[in-house]
A protein has these predicted regions:
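Low-complexity, Ser/Thr/Pro/Gly-enriched N-terminal "stalk/linker" regions
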Residues: 120, 138-207, 238-239, 243-258, ...
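Aromatic- and glycine-enriched glycan-recognition loops and surfaces
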Residues: 198-251, 265-274, 289-308, 359
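Beta-strand/loop-rich accessory regions of lumenal/periplasmic or secreted enzymes
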Residues: 1-122
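Well-ordered alpha-helical scaffold segments within catalytic/enzyme domains
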Residues: 215-231, 277-295, 340-355, 395-411, ...
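Carbohydrate-binding/catalytic loop surfaces
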Residues: 185-207, 253-274, 319-340, 377-399, ...
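Short Pro-Gly-centered flexible turn/kink motifs
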Residues: 117-142
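Non-catalytic carbohydrate-binding regions of carbohydrate-active enzymes
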Residues: 313, 366-378, 382, 407-537, ...
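Hydrophobic core segments within long, regular secondary-structure runs in both alpha-
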Residues: 163-178, 218, 231-245, 276-279, ...
Length: 563
């Protein structure tokens, strides 16, 4: 079930939808990035799918979210899933929606089953269409690719009418850089973590990588400020980099990942993901500065020291532990975050001309091929969860894309092939259709179209704008592999993800211009507040702004490696 269920969801806990809880599941269609269920037989390679092929266009509010509920009006949402039928896997589908054996209403919170009823007047008819299909694929990955291609052709998503040009979008997002700057503490930063949507007041949290992305946003602000006469942005960005050079490292030479000045606490467990995202931002910054004729030998020395820590942390199989302490003692050995390290390692090889970094990057690629891509098992790329998630396959595809810049010949072609395989899996998380909303639900009233937005993970059933370089990766694959569906999907994503831009006249319940929303709740689920059709009340615009900025800078990666 795309964007919701892969294999048996065995990496997800019992408190989320998984085989641990039941061997039969059916869910409402708007939980799925494609309203489809597919069953694949690994022994024979045979698969069956059922796809909703008419257009769901209306939704009705229900007085309860469990048990038998009579809807207040017309809905177009059905359900789909699979069932254990006498030890055989069976496809199920129907109308209106019915979720069993449990519904999923909040992170790690299963609720009782729900069955909806809609009134059908005497003599009234409703016509709904599902298409059954049989196919054969040699592997689970090729099955996912085949089904995605088929679904894309059947649903034919088109770009959303653009509201802003890339330049206009950046001008709006740049207001986040200006308003979120905090200069009251030794570390200067843009405040983008644990903000309230209602007022967007800055918090005391400085976070270098996910979810704050302080260093990447500082680079974005510097580049934009100098190019557009915004000296205020450039000056703030320089102060951020200067403060991190002076105060931003641990005694062991790692980047200080999360510092909460108001609560007077700081993490003492570090992650390969945040460290990698910090180095990634710093190398972009240094390359930009070098192009401007400015050198930073002290920064370069700091980064070299940090990269030596990377080389020490890497396991013999090429993976990196997910979490560790300042003395590099491993806290979480999971290798799911390994692709985040591939990016800065390839960049460091190019910037410093040190072959050790490329060797390390190659070893990460070997690990990803053997343990994630070949097994179609993308997991635990986030900071804490172990479940199946979008970011793992997206990061794997992006890692292989970066490897193509430091390789040639058959080696480069291998990375292209792996990038393509992982990209299909990542694409399966992105919506190919527009879910319907009921009147009074903000997203529906605002005309929101879900096509092009990505489901987050098995544990988190909302959509977001996590994209970064992935649209650029899709355009690269479209040209390199002669696959126009990739570039068409990229166009859908790039147009759709700018829909909810908070700007005067259409703030969409966000307190400040440019603070892009994070938790967009498009189905019967919420992160803590408000439910379908609304945002959660707490959000992290630090990463959403950084993600969209990267999407709006398609030449950034090629420019880095070319220079």
């Amino acid at each position: 079930m795309p964007g919701f269920w892969y294999h048996k969801n065995l990496r997800s806990p019992k408190s989320a939808p998984s085989f641990h809880t039941s061997d039969s599941w059916q869910v409402r269609e708007d939980r799925l990035s494609t309203p489809l269920t597919g069953i694949y037989d690994e022994k024979s390679g045979t698969y069956y799918t059922v796809l909703r092929t008419d257009t769901p266009d209306c939704e009705a509010l229900a007085c309860h979210n469990y048990g038998d509920v009579i809807l207040s009006g017309k809905t177009s949402l059905g359900f789909t899933g699979f069932r254990n039928a006498d030890a055989h896997a069976a496809l199920v589908f129907g109308f209106p929606y019915c979720e069993a054996p449990r519904s999923y209403v909040r992170k790690l919170t299963l609720a009782p089953a729900v069955r909806a009823f809609e009134k059908l007047e005497k003599g009234e008819t409703r016509r709904l269409t599902w298409t059954l299909r049989k196919g054969v694929s040699p592997s689970y990955s090729s099955f996912v690719a085949d089904v995605w291609n088929y679904s894309f052709d059947a649903l034919d998503p088109q770009p959303v009418k653009p509201r802003y040009t890339p330049a206009e979008a950046k001008a709006i997002l740049a207001e986040y850089f200006a308003q979120s700057y905090v200069g009251d503490y030794p570390l200067k930063y843009t405040s983008g973590v644990e903000l309230r949507t209602a007022d967007c007041e800055s918090t005391g949290i400085a976070e270098i990588g996910f979810v704050g992305r302080v260093l990447l946003n500082a680079y974005n602000a510097l580049e934009y400020g100098e190019a557009n006469g915004r000296e205020d942005l450039a000056a703030n960005a320089r102060s951020i980099f200067d403060s991190y050079l002076r105060y931003g490292f641990t005694p062991g030479g790692l980047l200080r990942e999360v510092v909460d000045f108001k609560r007077e606490r700081e993490t003492d467990v570090y992650s390969i993901r945040r460290q990698s995202e910090g180095v990634y931002a710093l190398l972009n910054y240094l390359a930009y500065e070098k192009q401007q004729g400015r050198s930073h030998p002290e920064w370069e020395a700091r980064i070299r020291t940090l990269l030596e820590k990377f080389l020490s942390l890497q396991n013999p199989d090429g993976s990196f532990p997910r979490k560790f302490r300042d003395n590099l003692t491993v806290v979480d050995a999971s290798g799911g975050s390994t692709p985040s390290a591939t990016l800065p390692l390839t960049m460091a090889y190019t910037y410093f001309k040190n072959e050790a970094y490329r060797r390390s990057a190659r070893r990460t690629a070997d690990y990803l091929e053997k343990n994630l891509i070949s097994k179609a098992d993308y997991f635990s790329s986030t900071l804490d969860a172990n479940c199946e998630d979008k970011e793992a396959s997206l990061y794997a595809a992006t890692a292989m894309y970066y490897m193509t810049f430091v390789s040639e010949g058959t080696e480069r072609q291998r990375y292209i092939d792996l990038c393509r395989e992982a990209a299909y899996f990542a694409l399966s998380w992105y919506y190919l259709w527009d879910v319907p909303f009921a009147q009074g639900q903000m997203l529906g009233d605002a005309g929101f179209r879900s096509r092009g937005w990505g489901n987050v993970s098995v544990e988190n059933n909302h959509v977001d704008v996590f994209i970064f370089e992935f649209a650029t990766v899709l355009d690269f694959l479209a040209e390199t592999c002669d696959e126009p569906r990739f570039s068409r999907t990229s166009a859908v994503i790039k147009s759709s993800m700018l829909q909810l831009m908070p700007v005067e006249g259409s703030m969409f319940e966000i307190g400040r211009t440019g603070y892009y929303p994070e938790v967009v709740q498009h189905t019967a689920w919420d992160y803590g507040k408000n439910g379908k059709g609304f945002y959660n009340d707490i959000f992290a615009p630090g990463w959403t702004v950084a993600s969209l900025w990267q999407m709006l800078s398609p030449d950034r990666v090629t420019t880095f490696f070319a220079n």
